[in-house]
Amino acid sequence: MPLAKHEWIITTDADCIVKKNWLFVLDLFIQQNNSEMVCGAVTYNCQNTFLHHFQQLDFASLQGATIGSFGISKPFMCNGANFAYTKKLFLNLKGFEGNNIIASGDDVFLLQKAVEQFPEKVSYLKSFETIVATKPLNNWKDLFHQRVRWASKTKVYKSNFSKILGLIVLCGNLGFIFLLFSLFSCFYSLASILYIIFFGILFLKFFVDYMLIQKTQKFLQTKSKYTLLSSFLYPFFSVAVAIYSLFGKYEWKGRRFS
């Protein structure tokens, strides 16, 4: 930070693609608002594979949750690939102090510090001109370890809202799996009732998820295939990630973390 010559720090990743007017629109937003921290949208540049489209849907849900949390004035998530803050705010928050031993998540922890101490200084810039595109992962193992790394940060979040929301999502996915397995272990009469309940819940979940994700993807100007299959697979993937993040180890940049 002492090497920074200007007041604003703007971050992205080396493999990201930014739009032509990214900095111009960001600067305009900063001048028009009394903000000292600005979060922006990130999406994937996908190829036509199930793995990439699965990540696109998952990531769109995270982006939707991010935008929604700002909409209800309870922001808890951001992405360092499209993030900006002032040097003054960074120093007032004592930077990344307090989360030095955590493998990743500097951006989220800095955001949550800012929301806790200076909520009026934190904003979300929802503009197509400032969407940053990054690359999805190309194999399931890397995707699993990435999501475990992301999930492992949740237990040290300062935001109780994010913890409660994560718990609700986990319980919902566990309930879906439990109900599914119950279909194959009950008597016929009970199973027929469970079938009705299961498919009713499945339809409701799919409909709500679809509407919210479609709204997010409309803003991101992305499209995903295999939506139904991804929605069916996601609860299993999500629960496995959550459990593994509590008890397992993961790899990141050639290093192992627990």
Task: List PLM regions with ranges.
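Catalytic donor/gating beta->alpha subdomain of glycosyltransferases that bind UDP-sugars
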Residues: 30-63, 91, 97-162
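Short aromatic/hydrophobic "clamp" motif used to bind/position activated sugar donors
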Residues: 9
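Membrane-embedded multi-pass helical conduit in multi-pass membrane proteins
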Residues: 165-249
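The conserved acidic donor/metal-binding loop of glycosyltransferases
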Residues: 13-17
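Short, conserved alpha-helix that lines the donor NDP-sugar binding/gating region
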Residues: 1-2, 111
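Long helical/loop segments within the catalytic core of UDP-sugar-dependent glycosyltransferases
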Residues: 12, 25-97, 151, 224-238, ...
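Acidic donor-diphosphate engagement hotspot in glycosyltransferases and nucleotidyltransferases
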Residues: 21-23
